[in-house]
Design a protein with these regions (language model features):
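Active-site environment of non-heme Fe oxygenases that use a 2-His-1-carboxylate facial triad
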Residues: 1-21, 34-38, 44-48, 97-249, ...
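N-terminal non-catalytic cap/leader segment that marks the start of a structured domain
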Residues: 1-101
Length: 307
């Protein structure tokens, strides 16, 4: 197990009452709106380190801020959400620092800043709800939580509710997007450049739509498929559909990853310790099966993403 994960998981076991509302109320709001904004208890900005500017800084910060990170994980357990990390991403750390790092300066990723991060679902190359799971590969995360440590004026995470996007699309476009006519590239935050083919963008399960849409990493395998995808891309850039989430330090947003799209506008990082800084956690609504774990004897949160 990643040593920092071990430290914060142990601390999370001894921290209670971080979530400011009951599990039932949290999930009622989350599943009705597809997102919920909440505030972590006893958050103190004066205890924060500088915003990391390179990966080793982030690892040191995790140990320095281990109480905060343990409380953050504890809130997920209180909400009935199982925190996970994926093989090949974030060096195995459960918590990702969403801040501009110099090593990611030229990338469109959560650790970049200079480029707009257009609407997307995280980890879209993995199986989504309504698809048959692969026996020994983890599924796409159900939830994504962002906790704000340091805000940047004018820079927001924005959400689009999937149902409102689908309402705007013509029926024939939705039908095409529901066919296995697409190639999905694994996002830049992962090591390597794997992709999957012959998958749909949209899946309907139990009368509910789920999505793996990613503005940057999906393309159609036919002219018809690409045309439908272009129409969805255009709709997702309609800012009338965007819900701006201007988080303040200590506030968090948890959203349903496959029932929303999220985006972030570009900004110019200063790399001086004062840049925008959030902490990201992926979650599953159910504990993953042992077969999905990379090393089940070592860690119950690290999911396999390739054979």
């Amino acid at each position: 197990m990643n040593i920092n994960n071990n430290v914060i998981l142990l601390k999370s076991n001894h921290i209670r009452g971080v979530l400011p509302l009951t599990r039932e109320k949290f999930n009622e709001i989350l599943h009705s709106e597809s997102y919920i904004i909440w505030k972590i208890k006893d958050f103190d900005t004066h205890e924060l380190a500088d915003t990391p500017v390179k990966s080793p800084d982030a690892q040191l910060v995790e140990l320095k801020n281990s109480d905060l990170h343990g409380a953050y994980l504890s809130a997920h357990f209180d909400a009935g959400i199982w925190p996970v990390v994926y093989q090949g991403e974030n060096n195995g750390h459960l918590i990702r620092h969403v801040c501009p790092l110099k090593t990611a300066e030229g990338k469109i990723s959560s650790q970049g800043g200079k480029f707009d991060f257009y609407p997307h679902v995280d980890n879209p190359d993995l199986k989504i709800t309504g698809e048959d799971s692969i026996s020994n590969i983890g599924n796409c995360p159900d939830t994504l939580t962002l906790l704000c440590l340091r805000a940047e004026p004018g820079v927001n995470t924005s959400l689009l509710q999937l149902d409102k996007v689908i309402e705007v699309l013509p029926e024939d476009v939705v039908q095409t997007l529901s066919k296995p006519l697409y190639r999905v590239k694994r996002p830049d935050s992962f090591e390597g450049s794997l992709s999957v083919e012959m998958v749909p963008v949209l899946v309907k399960s139990n009368d509910t739509w789920y999505s793996r849409f990613d503005w940057h990493n999906i393309n159609g395998l036919s002219a018809e498929a690409e045309m439908a995808l272009e129409k969805m891309r255009a709709v997702t850039l309609d800012k009338n559909l965007w819900l701006d989430i201007p988080l303040h330090p200590g506030e968090a947003v948890t959203f349903l990853n496959q029932r929303t799209l999220h985006t972030r506008n570009s900004f110019n990082p200063r790399y001086d310790g004062t840049d925008r800084w959030l902490l990201r956690i992926f979650g599953l609504m159910n504990r993953p099966p042992i077969s999905h774990l990379l090393e089940p004897h070592v860690c119950l949160h690290h999911l396999r993403t390739f054979l």
